[in-house]
A protein has these predicted regions:
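Sequence-specific dsDNA recognition surfaces
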Residues: 117-144
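Short, charged/polar surface micro-motifs in flexible loops or helix N-caps
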Residues: 131-134, 158-162, 186-187
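Signature of N6-adenine DNA methyltransferases within the class I
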Residues: 1-96, 121, 135-139, 150, ...
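Structured secondary-structure scaffolds
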Residues: 103-106
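Non-catalytic DNA-recognition/assembly elements of restriction-modification systems
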Residues: 41-44, 53-62, 221-293
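Conserved catalytic core of Hanks-type protein kinase domains
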Residues: 193
Length: 293
């Protein structure tokens, strides 16, 4: 048995000194307890229930959880979707052959990005002309090619605080910084699981460096609800979160599905009558306040 003092939440030396003498910052743990967690991290602050949770199936043993590609030259192979002719971007393609038959050069590319739950961060595209001919002839590390273009759940592998996962259903390829999982069903369940506070806590135990790559996420323990009513409720609520997040994302001009300024939209329809900007703005604020809160 060893005693540990956790001071990571204190910002400066003076507050750390004060925290050093507080009993709530002291923990006792056995070395063998660390071995219950994949990678044996020195997670002395983990409660017994958390350590016991790792006796369940790990996520990576149930579904593919994969690290994406490294192009070797992002400046050459990647663009923001707004930088190229939209007509040669292939959105929703099924496989690489579609880039040839439909004359598409650029494909959506999941690359992590800012904190964004449920849906969004659809900013980057990758040169996959002729089924990735140029990239395949380069020094790029093209991992897990059999999973390209498939529906996925992707997340920010690198984060400064809290991870966020999103549903990807637009025929994307994926980056090492936008690692992804590929369930064959139950997409909403896995997505909701990834966006829970408990997963955020588990990730910080498995890998305190906040680098949540495929290996780290694949070691998450997971339990499936037994009651069908609970499964249905999770599915319904998650789908609602996806739709709200998608509507929010598409309300910006940075989305390729943008149609009109949200100030011109009321209850999902284009405003017909002329009105004051102030009234439109207030209606906009009320609409999204109701959606999110």
């Amino acid at each position: 048995m060893a005693t540990y003092i956790r001071l990571t939440d204190y910002k400066d030396s003076d507050s750390k000194e004060q925290g050093f003498f507080k009993s709530e910052n002291r923990y006792e743990a056995k070395q063998e307890d660390f071995e219950k967690i994949p990678g044996s991290p020195i997670a002395y602050w983990a409660k017994e229930a958390i350590k016991k949770s790792f006796e369940n199936n790990l996520l990576g043993s149930i579904i593919p959880v994969k690290k994406g590609m490294d192009t070797g030259n992002n400046d050459l192979f990647l663009k923001l979707w707004t930088e190229v002719n939209f007509n040669i971007i292939g959105i929703g393609l099924v496989n690489g052959q579609d880039t040839i038959t439909q004359c598409k050069k650029w494909i959506p590319y999941n690359k992590g990005g800012e904190f964004q739950k449920w849906y969004g961060n659809k900013e980057y595209i990758i040169n996959w002309a002729n089924d990735g001919e140029e990239l395949k002839q380069s020094t790029a590390n093209l991992r897990s090619q059999h999973l390209y273009f498939k529906n996925a759940i992707t997340w920010n592998a690198l984060t400064s605080n809290t991870t966020s996962a999103r549903f990807s259903d637009y025929g994307a390829l994926f980056d090492s910084a936008g690692s992804s999982m590929f369930p064959s069903n139950l997409y909403n369940f896995y997505l909701s699981f990834m966006n829970t506070k408990i997963v955020d806590s588990l990730l910080k135990i498995i890998n305190p460096t906040l680098n949540y790559g495929a290996g780290t996420v694949g070691n998450l323990p997971i339990i499936f609800p037994k009651q069908e009513s609970v499964k249905q409720q999770i599915d319904t609520l998650t789908q609602e979160c996806i739709e709200i997040s998608k509507e929010d994302w598409d309300s910006r001009e940075t989305s390729w599905d943008f149609t009109a300024s949200p100030l011109l939209i009321e209850n999902g329809k284009l405003r017909i009558e002329n009105g004051k900007i102030e009234d439109a703005y207030n209606a906009y604020c009320e609409y999204w306040k109701e959606k999110f809160y």
